[in-house]
């Protein structure tokens, strides 16, 4: 078994294979020099000086005990589906019987003039957080481009580090795909009460500077000073290798419920996979799909059950949880129940279709998070939720 990628999906696939097949050879290849680690931790702990060991999913010993061979810090440059071989940048060829394609995704950096300057960083790898930590002593002003979960987490970390922080969101509201307008507004108020300035519905004209970034110029001509610009504009699946090898690609590598691709003996999972037209690129989905791909590669009859897309955010001295469909389909008629406490900055909103729960937003008090995740799966009735 050869696994391409050392993220959540690749790691979960390796573990699932070993549970079923104790003797087959398992090789895992990553282009980062570190053991597979918990990527969502990066923005949550920009300032925590984390070591590789602290965010690793397993210790080096675990891979040795499980007899999983790691090839770290190497790029895969080719995939030959006829010969069933993987080619590495140093010319090494590895034969596979079953291949798991889990190459994840990269940050999308919009083509804004000036984006290639020093001081413009997308937080995607451990190396990026190290870079930010090294720059910080010289940084007073930070601009974060993107008002999603990761952007706001990064903004809060920078604020705690003593910088003045501005968040720019191109959409008319924060987290518009997951939150309704009132919740987006509440999140903006909370952020601003913590001293983070938020601009929604903006256009970015250019990143100013002379090789080192010095500011961000908006479409209306306003200029914001910045020695550090963090980009958090979503991700794009890594599909180049799969495409060159002739696998079916849409926005990501197309898979069925067993995570099989269009080519026999090749499975894909995680951020780089797309199932039933959907690619959420979220951590729980990568873990789940990895397990299924690993099981299927061993000939097991596992099937992927869609993970409900949920979003949780901790920071700004508040917490947020949103899951399901929060009134996003203009052709449907939703019933809603809303509870608001502006003083304590608490907000709860429940969305129902045909009297059954389809979406939840909690801000401030998220103690019902586990209960609501269950209720969404069970399509709970209105009466059961709104007591």
Where are these regions (language model features)?
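Mid-to-C-terminal Rossmann-like scaffold of FAD/NAD(P)H-dependent oxidoreductases
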Residues: 6, 19, 272-369
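A Rossmann-like FAD-binding core segment of flavoenzymes
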Residues: 23-25, 64-66, 70-90, 94, ...
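Rossmann-like dinucleotide-binding cores of NAD(P)H-dependent redox enzymes
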Residues: 34, 52-56, 141, 150-206, ...
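Short hydrophobic core segments
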Residues: 4, 94-106, 145, 224-234, ...
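Beta1-alpha1 glycine-rich phosphate/pyrophosphate-binding loop at the start
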Residues: 1-69, 157-178
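FAD-site-proximal beta/loop scaffold in flavoenzymes
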Residues: 116-140, 208-217, 222-296
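Glycine-rich dinucleotide-binding loop and its adjacent helix/turn
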Residues: 103-161
């Amino acid at each position: 078994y050869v696994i391409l990628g050392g993220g959540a999906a690749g790691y979960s696939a390796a573990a699932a294979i070993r549970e079923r097949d104790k003797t087959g050879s398992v090789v895992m290849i990553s282009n980062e020099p570190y053991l597979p680690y918990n990527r969502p931790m990066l923005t949550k702990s920009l300032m925590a000086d984390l070591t590789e060991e602290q965010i690793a999913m397993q210790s080096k010993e675990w891979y040795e005990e499980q007899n999983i061979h790691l090839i770290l810090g190497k790029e895969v440059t080719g995939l030959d589906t006829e010969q069933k071989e993987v080619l590495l940048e140093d010319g090494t060829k590895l034969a596979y019987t079953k291949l798991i394609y889990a190459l994840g995704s990269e940050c999308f950096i919009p083509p804004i003039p000036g984006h290639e300057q020093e001081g413009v960083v997308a937080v995607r790898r451990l190396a990026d957080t190290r870079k930010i930590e090294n720059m910080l002593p010289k940084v007073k002003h930070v601009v974060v481009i993107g008002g999603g979960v990761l952007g706001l987490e990064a903004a809060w970390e920078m604020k705690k580090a003593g910088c003045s922080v501005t968040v720019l969101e191109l959409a008319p509201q924060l987290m518009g795909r997951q939150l309704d307008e009132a919740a987006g507004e509440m999140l903006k108020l909370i952020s601003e009460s913590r001293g983070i300035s938020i601009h929604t519905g903006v256009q970015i004209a250019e990143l100013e500077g002379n090789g080192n970034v010095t500011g961000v110029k908006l479409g209306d001509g306003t200029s914001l000073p910045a020695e550090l610009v963090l980009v958090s504009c979503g991700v794009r699946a890594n599909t180049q290798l799969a495409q060159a090898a002739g696998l079916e690609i849409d926005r990501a590598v197309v898979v069925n419920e067993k995570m099989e691709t269009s080519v026999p003996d090749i499975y894909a999972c995680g951020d780089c996979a797309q199932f039933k037209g959907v690619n959420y690129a979220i951590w729980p989905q990568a873990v789940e799909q990895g397990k299924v791909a690993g099981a299927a590669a061993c000939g097991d009859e596992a099937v992927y059950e869609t993970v409900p897309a949920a979003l949780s955010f901790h920071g700004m001295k508040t917490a947020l949880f949103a899951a399901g469909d929060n009134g996003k389909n203009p052709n449907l008629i939703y019933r809603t129940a809303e509870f608001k406490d502006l003083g304590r900055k608490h907000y709860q909103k429940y969305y129902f279709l045909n009297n059954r729960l389809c979406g939840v937003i909690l801000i401030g008090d998220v103690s019902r998070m586990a209960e609501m995740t269950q209720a969404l799966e069970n399509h709970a009735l209105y009466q059961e939720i709104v007591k």
